[in-house]
């Protein structure tokens, strides 16, 4: 599955002119340091690449980094890795994946949780997890995500 995600990202960003408009610029050197540090945290599924913006030659633009982890890598995936960094966590089952999501939200908080599935059963179980953990759930979301939409109503 991780390789399938990586291939989809590669295809989406294959045209540099399109990629720079999708990705946007890196805002600070901390993101670049995290990208470098994250490369060695697990299996490198998709390495980050620099992309030059034709209209903004001084812009720093990077493609996403995808790192494969195991459930034993909790100290890594339960931390925030701000930037174009994604972790794919190998689990034994959907139930285990949903349990990790529930425990992460309960233990660390979250504004949103996303699930992508074609299975009505998986979606129903994800709804139960989100309700139990007290987090907003998006199902098969495409387009923009409003990460902080809940913040104004947090009380």
Regions found by a protein language model. Give the residues of each.
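Conserved C-terminal structural/oligomerization subdomain of aldehyde/semialdehyde dehydrogenase
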Residues: 61-155
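Flexible, glycine/charged-enriched surface loops at secondary-structure junctions
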Residues: 14-25, 44-49, 110-118, 137-142
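Glycine-centered loop/turn motif at secondary-structure junctions
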Residues: 41-42, 134
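Flexible, acidic loop-helix segments that line cofactor/substrate-binding pockets
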Residues: 3-40, 48-60, 78-80
């Amino acid at each position: 599955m991780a390789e399938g995600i990586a291939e989809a990202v590669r295809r989406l960003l294959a045209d540099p002119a399109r990629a720079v408009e999708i990705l946007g610029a890196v805002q600070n050197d901390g993101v670049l340091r995290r990208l470098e540090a994250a490369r060695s945290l697990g299996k490198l599924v998709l390495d980050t690449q620099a992309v030059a913006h034709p209209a903004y030659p001084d812009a720093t633009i990077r493609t996403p980094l995808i790192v494969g982890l195991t459930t034993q890598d909790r100290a890594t995936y339960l931390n925030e890795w701000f930037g174009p960094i994604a972790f794919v966590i190998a689990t034994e089952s959907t139930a285990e994946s949903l349990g990790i999501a529930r425990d992460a939200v309960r233990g660390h908080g979250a504004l949103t949780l996303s699930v992508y599935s074609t299975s009505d059963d998986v979606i129903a179980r994800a709804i139960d997890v989100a309700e139990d953990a007290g987090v907003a759930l998006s199902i098969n979301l495409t387009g923009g995500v409003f990460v902080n939409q809940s913040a104004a109503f947090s009380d």
